[in-house]
Amino acid sequence: MDLRRDALQILKETSRTFYIPISIMPSGLQEAVASAYLCMRAIDEIEDHATLENHTKGILLQSISQTLQAGVDGFAVDAFSIGFKGYEDSLPEVSLRIREWAILAPESIAPRIWDATAAMADRMAYWSQINWKITNEYDLDRYTFGVAGAVGLLLSDLWSWYDGTTTNRMEAIAFGRGLQAVNILRNNSEDLTRGVNFSRRVGITRTFNSMLVVI
């Protein structure tokens, strides 16, 4: 099986928005960015799962995080599937195949992707277990950094690793937060059906508006 080709196909099915730029990236960088996107999409699908209970989401996400933290020079074939036991029929393919996405990136940068994904999975577990209770700007900043701003930092590291490109990491965080603000506003109705309201306070709505300025 050609893992790179398979990953691009899953990426195309998952998000054409991200597939298009990643598909034309040079070799090496393409595998690294595809690995990062698919690993994070894998955990995002669990966080946003429509039927899993929040407690279950937390357990699954923490299992992924712990497995990634234990990685040395790769992962055993069943490293992640052990944690998924009993939920194989509930989770999407992109989540079930996270091991493959984790080993897609070149060895010289893969551990950085594991680290970022593990940290994000832990943060998602925390927020899911408290039902995304965000009551002030401080909470919103923590959430948007944890699930989006940190992606900007990872991408900055990938550019630097590939060819030494230097980026403004504060702006990378702000851009990630802005994109997450768009996602929150766009998915507001869906979130409300599961009892999650990110914008219940006027102050938070103002913060959303300030985040949108960067994009």
What do the PLM-derived regions correspond to, one by one?
Residues M1-I215:
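Acidic catalytic motifs of isoprenoid enzymes
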